[in-house]
Amino acid sequence: MSRGLGDVYKRQARQIVDSFPKDQQLIFGPDKNLGNYINSVTGRNMLLWNGACHVHEKFSVEKIIELKQQYPDAEILVHPECKGAVAKLADKIGSTAGLLNYAINSTSKNFIVATESGILYEMRRKCPDKNFIPAPPEDSTCACNECNFMRLNTLEKLYNTLKYEWPEVQVDAEIARQAIKPIRRMLELSK
């Protein structure tokens, strides 16, 4: 089966999975942690691709527990791509937008945030009276909660891509033909 036959975006993953009959076996990828989370909220037992986001894999359960002891009133916000042991500590599991909206509407003043650190700027901008503490990685010598791949995107690159329509991505005609149906179906299901 072509990879294009089953791709979904994170925020739509549960909605897409729920659209299939419960007795239909599904293969979920590329993120096993997101797949585990979807399994837990849907009661499914999907087969999971053994891939994961390097940022969400590196949060330390022990260090988050230590932070929680320092800030006992803090709520722990966790992205569903985090390991299951981290997710079990969560007061709220949600997408980037879901975590931001939760923080805006919460009466809590302190939050421990277990996701890519780029969200912290927006959280602090929208909630200047609240304290957002990045969840620590297992390795204290690195900036492991920053995604190097996301940092490759810049406004200048986006501008040039829109203006000059480059870089051009070439897709094999047969792959494009096979991919168009699930992409359209995914968009229909996510409305």
Predicted regions and their residues:
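Active-site rim loops that border cofactor/substrate pockets in soluble metabolic enzymes
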Residues: 49-112
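Short, well-ordered alpha-helical microsegments
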Residues: 13-14, 34-36, 64, 86, ...
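Loop-centered beta-sheet repeat module
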Residues: 13-49
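Short, solvent-exposed amphipathic alpha-helical segments in soluble enzyme
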Residues: 21-22, 39-45, 70, 91-93, ...
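Single conserved hydrophobic/aromatic residue that forms the stacking wall/gate
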Residues: 1-9
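C-terminal functional extensions of proteins
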Residues: 80, 98, 106-108, 115-121, ...
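Short, surface-exposed amphipathic charged segments that create phosphate/polyanion-binding patches used
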Residues: 19-25, 43, 61-67, 111, ...
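Short beta->alpha connector loops at strand-helix junctions that form conserved
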Residues: 10, 48-52, 134-138
